[in-house]
Amino acid sequence: MKRSNSIAVMLVLVLSSLMLLLPVEGQGHEGHGVGEILLMGKLGAPVCGVRASGRVCPDGYCCSQWGYCGTTEEYCGKGCQSQCDYNRCGKEFGGKECHDELCCSQYGWCGNSDGHCGEGCQSQCSYWRCGKDFGGRLCTEDMCCSQYGWCGLTDDHCEDGCQSQCDLPTLLPSPLRRIIAIRKLKANLANMLS
């Protein structure tokens, strides 16, 4: 009898844990269910603001309307609760430059996409750029320079038309390059959080 009770209790615990990960329409952060939010709070973005008794984010992070810390427009834009100008830059923000070598877009947001570093970029516009159109500039951190002059580790950067630093990453299979890129991003994020 004790054994069947133990199994039943264990089954209930396992099933209830799985149910926490099911998305709940209209609840949580960006369509995530409550269980996902709890997981994100533990493994991902720290909680902040009203839902966390007024706790603020680590330096450099905005507290979103949902009560999570981050650096993108989703966190620092509409509904942001505190530290909302971290990922902002440019003339409308007193000439503030972006952190971590990111480009300042024409709209005053920090990032490294073509929308940030391309036409209209306000400052630090060439960090993610490379190649013949940028004075032969090489990429940092062992990244390839794509045919279009962007630094990265994807097939688009390291294969057809790659301008420089193409050899080492192309010796690695594509999934491994993605893993390396993800690890570098995680390391950068960990450095920002510490």
From Swiss-Prot:
Protein's job: N-acetyl-D-glucosamine binding lectin. Almost no hemagglutinating activity towards human erythrocytes. Low mitogenic activity towards human peripheral blood lymphocytes.
Disulfide cross-links: 48-63, 57-69, 62-76, 80-84, 89-104, 98-110, 103-117, 121-125, 130-145, 139-151, 144-158, 162-166
PROSITE patterns linked: CHIT_BIND_I_1, CHIT_BIND_I_2
Signal peptide residue numbers: 1-26
Transmembrane regions: none
MF terms (GO), sorted A to Z: carbohydrate binding; chitin binding
Any single biological process term in GO: positive regulation of cell division
Presence of keyword Zinc: no
Chitin-binding type-1 domain location: 45-86, 87-127, 128-168
InterPro entries (UniProt xref): Chitin-bd_1, Chitin-binding_1_CS, Endochitinase-like_sf
Residue positions assigned to the propeptide: 27-44, 171-194
Protein name listed in UniProt: Lectin-C
Pfam families, per database record: Chitin_bind_1
Keyword line: Chitin-binding, Disulfide bond, Lectin, Mitogen, Repeat, Signal
The protein's assembly and partners: Homodimer. The homodimers are asymmetric; formed in a 'head-to-tail' fashion via hydrophobic interactions between aromatic residues of the carbohydrate-binding sites of each subunit.
Record bears the keyword Endoplasmic reticulum: no
